[in-house]
Amino acid sequence: MESVVVKISGSLVHPPRLDYLTRLRDVLWGLVDGGFRVAVVVGGGGLARSYIDVLRRAGVSEALLDEMGIESSRLNASLLAKLLYPRSQPYPLASLREVLEVFMTGLIPVSGGFQPGQSTNAVAAVIAEALGARTLLNCLKGVEGVYSDEPSTPGARLLRRLTYRQLEDILVKVSSQRAGSYTLWDMVALSVARRSGLRIVFFDCSDPANIWGALKGEKGSIVEG
């Protein structure tokens, strides 16, 4: 059975919308029914950013802001894990070891962040590497894939296929490594993906059915090689 890791933007989970979340649940269950072994990682999204913004303006350290982001992502992950139950554990997992233990039982492991200084994108890449997954699906909200520049920049082009090096060049231009700001991908996650030869698909998951299209290479941007 092929393993696949699904990284879900926290902005897709919070604020929670029942119709969307049940459709997302059904697609994830459908992947399992279709013969895939699935692991899920959920980001902190707007929930994390709102908390982090207040704390940063209050002068709180980046290390503690990272902790706030982790806790926010785990709350989002807890929501999805409970929704996926009984085909998932009903609580967020907090380490690679816990993910592997749940995965070996045949359930869908659901996690948020693991540790300060590590984005949920990096968590997803590490999990994919550990599970031997070939593909990592990065579910975005309202963004079709990877663009040549910030999507709002005039002249920015959607790139359907690109290499790790091309993604790295784009990240240098558009990414910040501050807590709560891993909007596309980050260098730690990229280094893990590169060393393990992951195929990453960035795509708009405003419609959960797009997960199937991304898995087939019909949606979004594919990064590999």
Swiss-Prot record:
Keyword Ubl conjugation listed: no
InterPro entries per UniProt? AceGlu_kinase-like_sf, Asp/Glu/Uridylate_kinase, Uridylate_kinase, Uridylate_kinase_arch/spir
Briefly describe activity regulation: Inhibited by UTP.
Its protein name is Uridylate kinase
Extract the HAMAP family matched here.
PyrH_A (MF_01220_A)
Q: Per the record's keyword annotation, is Cytoplasm included, yes or no?
A: yes
**Cross-referenced Gene3D superfamilies, in alphabetical order?**
Acetylglutamate kinase-like (3.40.1160.10)
Q: Any one Gene Ontology biological process term?
A: UDP biosynthetic process
Reaction catalysis annotation: UMP + ATP = UDP + ADP
**Can you tell me which family this protein belongs to?**
Belongs to the UMP kinase family.
Q: Which Pfam families match?
A: AA_kinase
- What role does it play? Catalyzes the reversible phosphorylation of UMP to UDP.
- Which range is the signal sequence, renumbered to this chain? none
Residues engaged in binding ATP:
K7, I8, S9, G10, S11, G45, R49, Y147, E150
| Class of the enzyme per the UniProt entry, highest EC level | transferase
Recorded GO cellular component terms are: cytoplasm
Quaternary structure per UniProt? Answer: Homohexamer.
Q: In which pathway does it act?
A: Pyrimidine metabolism; CTP biosynthesis via de novo pathway; UDP from UMP (UMPK route): step 1/1
Alphabetically list the UniProt keywords.
Answer: ATP-binding, Cytoplasm, Kinase, Nucleotide-binding, Pyrimidine biosynthesis, Transferase
Protein location:
Cytoplasm
Chief localization class? Answer: cytoplasm
Residue positions binding UMP:
G44, D66, F114, Q115, P116, G117, Q118, S119, T120
